[in-house]
Structure formats: C-alpha cells, structure tokens
Amino acid sequence: MNTAVNVNVVHESEAQRQFARVKLPARIRYIGANREGVDARLLDLSAGGFAFTASGAPIQPGDLYKGKLLFQVDSISFSLEVEFQVRSVDPASRRVGCEFQNLKPREVAALRYLITSYLAGEVIGVGDMLNTLQRENFTKARKQGGGNGGMGFFGRVRAVTLSTAIFVVGVGAFAFILNQMYNLYFVTHADSGVVSVPNQQITMPREGTVQSLLGPNAEVAKGAPIATFSANLLDMLKGNLTEEQLNPGNIEKLFGHQMKGTLTSPCDCRVVQQLVADGQYANKGQVIFTLAPRDSVASIEARFPYRNAAELAPGTRVNFQVAGDGVNRSGRIVNTAPVDGDLSSEIRVQIQPDQPLDAQYAGRPAEVSIGGLPGRTLLNKAVTLATAR
C-alpha cells in the first residue's frame, strides 16, 4: 500500500494532536536573558506554539519571553506580538520548542487562518487577513448560575415550577382552542332558547293602578286574592252618562271617588312574573301577572336555523344549560314546527328534560346544543373556570 506523506506537516504528541505544526516562512524576534536581541527562523508553527534553532544565547526550559512573530504576505510584512514559554531544548541540535502564553482571540484567529490556508494550499491575502481579524471568531462562554457551576436547591425548584407552569398554560391553551374548534364545526347550536312553563295570565279589568298582595314566586290557592286595583269612577262611567248628567257638579263628585276591586287566582298557582309594578297605572286588558300551575312541568323551547332541520327529528338528544343554574342538563326533542308557519325562517323545537326542571326557571334564557363527545361537560367546566379567572 502506497501512502502519500506530506513532509511539511508534523504532528505533536498524542495529547496535543489538535495542533498541526506546519513549516511556514516566518521568524521570531525577542530579547534574550542578557538583554540581547535574538532573531531566528521558525522551524515549524502551530496554534499552540512554535520551534526554532537557538543561537549561542543561553536559554533554559521554563524561561518566559516576549517577542514578535514576523510573516511575509504579498510583499507586505506584518507581525504578531506574542508571549511564549520555553518547553524543551535539545542540546545537540539546539532545537527549542515554545508554547504560546496569554494569546488574545485576535492573535489566535490570525494564526488559525494562516495555518488553515497553508494546509489547504490557498493564497494568503491581506484582505482575507483583515476580514478574519474584524469578525467574531469565538463564541461567548455560558453564564454560570452559581459559583459552583450549577443551580442551588431554590434555583432548581424555581426552574421546575416555571417549566411546569408554562407546560400547564400551554396544555390549557391547546385544550381551549381544541374545544372551541370542536364546538364550531361539530356541535349544532340553537339561535335562542328559553324555559317554558304552561301559564295563565291575569289582565287588568279596568284602567287604574295595581297593588300586589304577594311576593315574587309566591304560591296562591285557587280563588285567593293576589292583588287589588283602584279605578277612577269617572273613567268607568264615561260614555254612559247623558249630557245633563255631565254637569260640573257631578263631574267634580265623580272625579273624587275611587272604585276598588280584587284580582283572584284562577288555579292553584305560583307567581312567575309581575309585569306591572305596584302603584303603576295599567290600561284595561293589560297583563298584570303570569301564573304557573303548581304541578306544571317546565320544558325548553328553542329555535334552530332551518338548515339544521335534518338534525331536529323527535327523540334527538340535546344538551342545554339554563342561565343562573350552572348545571349542564340533557333532554330530548318531543316536537318541532316552523315558526309562524314560514318555511324559510326558523324551526321551533320543544325539549323535554331528562330530569325535572324547577318551574321557577320559567322565562330564563337557555343555551341549547346538539352533539358532543363524552366528557365535554367536564371540559366545558374547566374552560369556564379558566376564562372566569
């Protein structure tokens, strides 16, 4: 086997193999131990040191000197100021091996550029040398957290806590986005929903003022009074009096008299809503109270877009939540019909809850949806809690 050998490349010891020594045309100038000037040609050069043949000047291993390395490039000479220490001296050949000391990054970059270009066979140019000296050739050292080169106990706890918090926030944000996308593309939502209870309305028999005898959500038996009203006698007789009876004296007497009456309950009911405040004037026929029978069962009435008609078959499972209840409930569709008979508008859906719904929720809005994966209730609660905070 024929192996090509480059005689210009000499390797140092195994421990120093990272520094390739090359024979560059360069010289070293320094002041000797006796203050005499020494100028010698380099035998070889590496990024870690150099070697030269010493003259008759005394030199010993361990001596420390300051000098200049002189290079000739494109008929231009330039020098590098270096500090070096004598590491070995061969008495027979007077070969002196030296090691660089306290080299700055610029000097190291220049030496590496010269050696690399020489080994690659490239022409060394002044412009390339200037570019090498101007750019940043070394990475900065990493910052140490402490004097011992590592973090302490509290530093580790803080780092783990911060990492865990960032991880939890990231998982929560991902779950929130996933839940929103699922609700948007895979869940059908009603445009509106309300808790509906069979009710009866109490209207004003005469023009006048109303005074309630019961509080909100109060229960009342059939025939029991629920409110009193007072009407002006003149307003009641208006249109029934002749011109002779409408003299100023009679008008003054009638104007000062009030007729009082009582509004009674038509069933064993509960007061769902009072539509006219106490002492407020009401017209004849105006609804005063909305009553719901005690044994009535509340249901949900919702409106869906007509494009979702295929999903609104009777028996379809739905999910809903009543405002102010905070509980996710389920039910099924029992009846569907177009709103006001108009096929181009919305579809009215009546929903029967799986669990009895308190009639006190009558009139409250409800959020109704069709579809959903198992466990969405827990996910919705978690998302609601996170957004509330």
Curated annotation (Swiss-Prot):
<dbReference type="GO" id="GO:0035438">
    <property type="term" value="F:cyclic-di-GMP binding"/>
</dbReference>
<keyword id="KW-0328">Glycosyltransferase</keyword>
<dbReference type="GO" id="GO:0047643">
    <property type="term" value="F:alginate synthase activity"/>
</dbReference>
<feature type="domain" description="PilZ">
    <location>
        <begin position="16"/>
        <end position="116"/>
    </location>
</feature>
<keyword id="KW-0808">Transferase</keyword>
<dbReference type="GO" id="GO:0015125">
    <property type="term" value="F:bile acid transmembrane transporter activity"/>
</dbReference>
<dbReference type="Pfam" id="PF13437">
    <property type="entry name" value="HlyD_3"/>
</dbReference>
<dbReference type="GO" id="GO:0042121">
    <property type="term" value="P:alginic acid biosynthetic process"/>
</dbReference>
<dbReference type="InterPro" id="IPR009875">
    <property type="entry name" value="PilZ_domain"/>
</dbReference>
<comment type="similarity">
    <text>Belongs to the Alg44 family.</text>
</comment>
<dbReference type="GO" id="GO:0004467">
    <property type="term" value="F:long-chain fatty acid-CoA ligase activity"/>
</dbReference>
<dbReference type="GO" id="GO:0042597">
    <property type="term" value="C:periplasmic space"/>
</dbReference>
<dbReference type="GO" id="GO:0044010">
    <property type="term" value="P:single-species biofilm formation"/>
</dbReference>
<dbReference type="Pfam" id="PF07238">
    <property type="entry name" value="PilZ"/>
</dbReference>
<comment type="function">
    <text>Required for alginate biosynthesis.</text>
</comment>
<comment type="pathway">
    <text>Glycan biosynthesis; alginate biosynthesis.</text>
</comment>
<keyword id="KW-0574">Periplasm</keyword>
<dbReference type="GO" id="GO:1990961">
    <property type="term" value="P:xenobiotic detoxification by transmembrane export across the plasma membrane"/>
</dbReference>
<dbReference type="InterPro" id="IPR050739">
    <property type="entry name" value="MFP"/>
</dbReference>
<protein>
    <recommendedName>
        <fullName>Mannuronan synthase</fullName>
        <ecNumber>2.4.1.33</ecNumber>
    </recommendedName>
</protein>
<dbReference type="GO" id="GO:0009276">
    <property type="term" value="C:Gram-negative-bacterium-type cell wall"/>
</dbReference>
<dbReference type="GO" id="GO:0005886">
    <property type="term" value="C:plasma membrane"/>
</dbReference>
<keyword id="KW-0016">Alginate biosynthesis</keyword>
<dbReference type="GO" id="GO:0015721">
    <property type="term" value="P:bile acid and bile salt transport"/>
</dbReference>
